[in-house]
Every structure is written in C-alpha cells, then in structure tokens.
C-alpha cells in the first residue's frame, strides 16, 4: 500500500468551528492509522479577509485536541510565485488564455441569458482570440475546459459522480490583479504536497469537477476524494452558534474535555459496529473513511454532555486539579489529601463539564448564607432544632477521619428519636449545604471537617 498523505486546509477568515475540526480529525486519523503523513495548510490567499488571530486560533485548537501535523505549516500566501509558474505553464501550452471581458460586459451577458431562461455563464468568447487586446482592460486567465467530455470520479462517501464538461464554463484561474483563484491553488498544493486522499465537507463537491480539469491539464495525479455531509442541528437545519457552530476553543472554556469532543465529533458522521466510546488509540485502530456516513449528522448537546460526563468520571483527582486550573473556584488548600480526593470523587459523578464541577466545588465549600426556601418552609422547626443541637454535640465527639463513624452518628439520632431518616437528613443537608440536594451527607461531613460542620449547624440554628 502506498503512503497515505492527507491534509487539513482551513482559510483563516474566521475561527475554527466544529465542522472544520471534525474534518481535520478524519484526515488525521486516516493518515495516522496507516502510518502516513498529515499536513496543515493555511489557505490565506485572500489577503483582504485574512486574520492572524484566526490562524493562531486554528493552531491553538490543534494543540488543545492533540492533532499533531507533520513538517511545517504551509502558508499559501508565501507561494504566489509557484502558482504563477503553473499558470504560465498552462498559458504556454495553450491550455489557458487571457480573457478581456469587462465586468460590465459579463453582467450584461448574464442578464441576456437569464432573459432567455438560460443558465448564466461565460460564453468562451476569448477562448480562441487572436486579435489585438482591448485597451484599458486587465485580463483574467481562464482554463480551457475540454468540451463534450464526462468527468467521473468515485467519491468515497457519495459514490460515483459524473459531470459533463459542457456544464462547466471556462472558469477563472487567475484574477485581473494576477492572484490565483481557490480551485487553482488547491490542486497545485495538493499535487506538490503529494496528497493522496482528500477528506472534506460536501460543500466542496461542486468544486471537484473543476479541480479534476486542472489536475489533468497539469498532468498531476488525481487524489481520492471523500466528501462528508455537513453537521445539522437537532431540527435538521444548518448549525448556528446557539446550536454548536462556534469557535472550537469555546468548548474548552465551557469545560469540555478534548477526549470527549474528539469522540463526539468522530461519531458525527462515522460509525463502527455499535460502539459509542472510543479512545484515541481505539480510533486509530478502527477508523476507515469507507465507514463515513453518506447522510448528514445531527449535533446533540445531550450526547456531548453524556460523553463528557463519562470522560470526567474517569479522571483521577490529580488530573482533575490540572484540568480545573483555568476555572475559578474556592481555595482547596485547607483540605487534606483524603478530603480533596473525596470532594472530587463525589462531585465528578454529579457533573457533566469542568465548569459545572467548579461551580459544585463552590456549592460545597462556600458556607450557605441563605437556605432553599421551599425546603426550609416544610421543616417542623420545633422538632428539628433540638435534633440538630443534639447532633452538633455528637459531632464534637465523632471521628471525622472515618466516614462510617459519621454515618453511625446520624443513624444514632434517628434511632434514639424514633423518626424517619428523611425527617432528620433533609434539615441536616439544608444546614450543611443550603439546599435540599447535593452530595451524600457523610461525604459532606467528611469533606467539611469537624470545625466547619459544627459551625454551619450553629449558623443554621441561629436562623
């Protein structure tokens, strides 16, 4: 098998979104799974729209999710001389020509064609022009598209695709200012980089016949194509920012783990048996672009949160502390190692994101200044206050290094007072945490420690 060489080639006109990241991951997996090469190319030929910040954000996103590319990043803006050489080659071989048609003439032609209910297109009037060029017109360069031919290719996702060249006009490969067009620079770079397989969004499918015309004109080897359907929202519509089409780095800020995001995106458009959870190593062992789905996939926050919760639960306390560094939460330095481990173990089971985990740390470690009203109103204060006073005395003698001892202290009150567990546990939870839900009470007592637990009960009794 020949060496697999893939690439990801974004335009730095905006931040990298999840559709682009998914395409990059597919290309990365295919190359790495076959011990091939994966390149990053920045398509920055549109100098008026380029953003250095956007280019840097693409690189930052790659670093975050762990996509390592081979060699140096290729910037198209530094390769204009190379493109000009190949444009000149086509001109010299009479495979391309200068077109002196002005914009006004082209607009008028299109209006006439529309009036005749024809498809607006250039009419090839300068294809075989041998006369004197009109003055004051900076020409564009157009490729001579072969006529009456069928361009066919077997797309790895879409299947057999055929287009008659008569449906194509002689499209522009260099603008009047000499800058090359997108379709031209793409095929030159793919050929010179030795790209064997192109995995990209199916919005590029219509470009492929034109690119094949150029591959053939320059005698370049045509790569294999895989055109992946776009990601839709849960209503089957194009993704909006509200539905997930946002900067990839926003997901890091929202508290998603890179492993979860990669797993989620790969499953949006690719499947392997009935498996849902994939480590990067498993993806490298299983991924084959032949298994890419031909139908659009739907973005689901519920699915992403489920996957992220799975990966969160499997993180060690030490790793979680590292991952939590970008987020703001209460100081943990007063906790001993056992308390810290217990805190993170308890809360990671109840959190879907790192951001949510950070908030839950605050919910436990910041003493309540007010109490959940609907729970507080249901309390029988005449019954509860003496019980909490008695339990406070029990806690002063309890061994806080042993969770079972703390649990026994709670059950002692319940048994001695002959009350239902909920009648005591609910107000105790309210006193310790300020609300009716949260982590287990023996966990809360162990994490807070004797002094803080007693203090919180005393504050509750004062209210």
Curated annotation (Swiss-Prot):
ATP binds at residue 241. The keyword Ubl conjugation does not apply. The keyword Zinc does not apply. Keywords: Aminoacyl-tRNA synthetase, ATP-binding, Cytoplasm, Ligase, Nucleotide-binding, Protein biosynthesis. It holds the Pfam family tRNA-synt_1c. One of its GO terms (biological process) is glutamyl-tRNA aminoacylation. It is an enzyme of class 6 (ligase). One of its GO terms (molecular function) is ATP binding. A motif ('HIGH' region) lies at residues 10-20. Disulfide bonds: none annotated. Its EC number is 6.1.1.17. GO terms for cellular component: cytosol. It is found in: Cytoplasm. A motif ('KMSKS' region) lies at residues 238-242. It catalyses: tRNA(Glu) + L-glutamate + ATP = L-glutamyl-tRNA(Glu) + AMP + diphosphate. InterPro entries: aa-tRNA-synth_I_cd-bd, aa-tRNA-synth_I_codon-bd_sub2, aa-tRNA-synth_I_CS, aa_tRNA-synth_I_cd-bd_sf, Glu-tRNA-ligase_bac/mito, Glu/Gln-tRNA-synth, Glu/Gln-tRNA-synth_Ib_cat-dom, GluQ/Sye. Gene3D superfamilies: 1.10.10.350, HUPs (3.40.50.620). Catalyzes the attachment of glutamate to tRNA(Glu) in a two-step reaction: glutamate is first activated by ATP to form Glu-AMP and then transferred to the acceptor end of tRNA(Glu). Belongs to the class-I aminoacyl-tRNA synthetase family. Glutamate--tRNA ligase type 1 subfamily. Monomer. This is Glutamate--tRNA ligase 1. The lineage of its organism: Bacteria, Pseudomonadati, Campylobacterota, Epsilonproteobacteria, Campylobacterales.
